[in-house]
């Protein structure tokens, strides 16, 4: 379940 959250956080950080 944290997989999706981690992916989202990474996307936001990169942005």
Curated annotation (Swiss-Prot):
Its cofactor is coenzyme F430. It catalyses: coenzyme B + methyl-coenzyme M = methane + coenzyme M-coenzyme B heterodisulfide. Belongs to the methyl-coenzyme M reductase alpha subunit family. It is found in: Cytoplasm. Its main location: cytoplasm. It is an enzyme of class 2 (transferase). This is Methyl-coenzyme M reductase subunit alpha. Optimum pH is 7.0. Its EC number is 2.8.4.1. Pathway: One-carbon metabolism; methyl-coenzyme M reduction; methane from methyl-coenzyme M: step 1/1. Signal peptide: none annotated. The lineage of its organism: Archaea, Methanobacteriati, Methanobacteriota, Stenosarchaea group, Methanomicrobia. MCR from M.thermophila is a heterotrimer composed of an alpha, a beta, and a gamma subunit. Optimum temperature is 60 degrees Celsius.
